[in-house]
Amino acid sequence: SIYNVNNIDTNVLHKFDEKARKKFFSRTVRGMSNSPELNLAEMQFNLLKQRAADGDSFVVLGRCSDEIFLGLADVVKIFIRANLDAKVKRVMTKREMDAVTAVKTMERHDKKRRAYHDYFCQSKWGDVSAYDICIDSSKLDIDGTVEFLYEYIQRYLAR
């Protein structure tokens, strides 16, 4: 994980991860911010850019990666979506909750993801033009989607 690369305790920073800066409680003076959300995001962005520049092969989920890697060669930007029924069933199974709670949980997480992405990026969260490929995982199921994306990436990298 990003935290372990920099020897940072995950328990301390987890509450600031993928959250937009709280403007009321933070200040920026001479380019330095006291916002843990902003500082953590910038640290993550810099680490990801450095790993890509070093030629490392890795997968990033979220974290504004569509914009972080903009213009870099050999980067495949993928947006995976699913229909509501498939997402609700998956959340219910994974988190052992009823459908109503699953929908509320998804809405809350998506709202936070959107706020984080849109705070740090020029593109809007979920804008398909920011990605190389968008796929609905409910069409092929998860295993089928993985197989499809694996083949796509292999062909992309072999070009």
Regions found by a protein language model. Name each.
Residues 155:
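Glycine-rich phosphate-binding loops of nucleotide-dependent enzymes
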